[in-house]
UniProtKB/Swiss-Prot annotation:
It is a single-pass type II membrane protein. The core complex is formed by different alpha and beta chains, binding bacteriochlorophyll molecules, and arranged most probably in tetrameric structures disposed around the reaction center. The non-pigmented gamma chains may constitute additional components. This is Light-harvesting protein B-800/820 alpha chain. Belongs to the antenna complex alpha subunit family.
């Protein structure tokens, strides 16, 4: 691990939850942006348009 010295500045008990929280928030923001700025994603989640038989 080439970034191992970061734990001499920031303790792991503070840094790990901070990093994991930042990753989770970023993922939620990306998903929210996709949901609100596309027209196809909601239809994809609903399974698309059903064709009449």
């Amino acid at each position: 691990m080439n970034q191992g010295k970061i734990w001499t500045v920031v303790p792991p008990a503070f840094g790990l939850p901070l990093m994991l929280g930042a990753v989770a928030i970023t993922a939620l923001l990306v998903h929210a942006a996709v949901l609100t700025h596309t027209t196809w994603y909601a239809a994809f989640l609903q399974g698309g348009v059903k064709k009449a038989a």
